[in-house]
């Protein structure tokens, strides 16, 4: 019989087996090394988590729950999943007799849909923060003319908003809730820089026995470290992704009270949540990812990680202060977490122009809709986060330098555009123009970016 090894069945290292793909990955490695990453939803995963994700665990199917699998040979992956669950509950100080956690969701969006599927009837009512106000797509986003997210297609969604100051309008929220009477009230946001009054939201949700669900994907490390209010005291269900502040692989955790009482009836959330994840929406869990999450959760429970989260907030506030000193407007006037939203309307440039020019200079951030914008595709703001740069080692001094660079980019964009909105093609032409990119103003900014990136290397 022919030896499969002789035919390359086992392929060998990526560099040898697929040099084309290897070269592309190496290109991304170099980009990450040379780029200042200010995207609020990104971070640098722990090397141990990446090692687990590249392990033989990817070979194993294990549909079902621990002890209730549909496959044999799950002894080791069962132990890994139990370890991940244990560490997740411990990180937030949760009593396992009161709280359960499902660690199988592939990422945050399907986790959210699983939650709705578990507790909201088909066509039932969900209520979350509007996307231009800082909510997430999966919280029921739709426009006046089109349903965008599946959460607005399969459920009846109605948004609440922030006020003109950028803060959640709790009075308006309460009025909308009373008019709409949703089955689930969603809090926790993707572009909101302030803390959340979970107690007040619990009081509102209790009016008709609605479930209160917190999506803390952006702020879960800050909650775990005690730097932000905890939703666990007041919410029925809590979800977080694992790749942002937790520095794990892409996945999600759904925490749920094992049983809750709604309108006089006991609801078995343990059964509902787990059944919604599997078999309703998913098949076999990604065991390699669960192992990577378990490793990240171990790190997240250390004093060193608590210090990291403290520095994340410190850096965010330092950057906020610097940008304000340069005359830039910050939505809500400040920040309580890892992100800030810069309102560019007074500068004469939009978020797309700043994002595009920053990208050309080696800074990653994203355009972001702010209150009053009609479309997230043509926003008036940018969202800036400090998880990744803090993991890299940046401190207050470096954040002031980052703020000065962003201020320089805004000034450059204003000079380039003359206050007019530019199309994506126009922006591409500008950043491809050797005269523009070779100007002294641009070269100085690029050198400053390179100096910061070189001073704080990654994965060495």
Curated annotation (Swiss-Prot):
InterPro entries reported in the protein's UniProt record: PyrdxlP-dep_Trfase, PyrdxlP-dep_Trfase_major, PyrdxlP-dep_Trfase_small, Ser_HO-MeTrfase, Ser_HO-MeTrfase-like, Ser_HO-MeTrfase_PLP_BS, SHMT-like_dom
State its role. Interconversion of serine and glycine.
Tell me the subunit arrangement.
Answer: Homotetramer.
| Record-listed E.C. numbers | 2.1.2.1
UniProt KW keywords: Cytoplasm, One-carbon metabolism, Pyridoxal phosphate, Transferase
One Pfam short name: SHMT
GO terms of molecular function: glycine hydroxymethyltransferase activity; pyridoxal phosphate binding
Q: Where in the cell is it found?
A: Cytoplasm
Decide whether keyword Methyltransferase is in the record. no
Principal localisation: cytoplasm
Q: Which PROSITE patterns match?
A: SHMT
Q: Which family does it belong to?
A: Belongs to the SHMT family.
The set of disulfide-linked cysteines is none
> Which cofactors, by name?
pyridoxal 5'-phosphate
Which HAMAP family does the entry mention? SHMT
- Protein name per UniProt: Serine hydroxymethyltransferase, cytosolic
Residues modified to N6-(pyridoxal phosphate)lysine? 244
Tell me the gene name: SHMT-1
Tell me which GO cellular component terms the UniProt record holds.
mitochondrion
Q: In which pathway does it act?
A: One-carbon metabolism; tetrahydrofolate interconversion
Q: What NCBIfam families does this protein map onto?
A: PRK00011.1
Listed under catalytic activity are:
(6R)-5,10-methylene-5,6,7,8-tetrahydrofolate + glycine + H2O = (6S)-5,6,7,8-tetrahydrofolate + L-serine
Primary enzyme class: transferase
Organism (species)? Encephalitozoon cuniculi (strain GB-M1) (Microsporidian parasite)
Lineage: superkingdom: Eukaryota
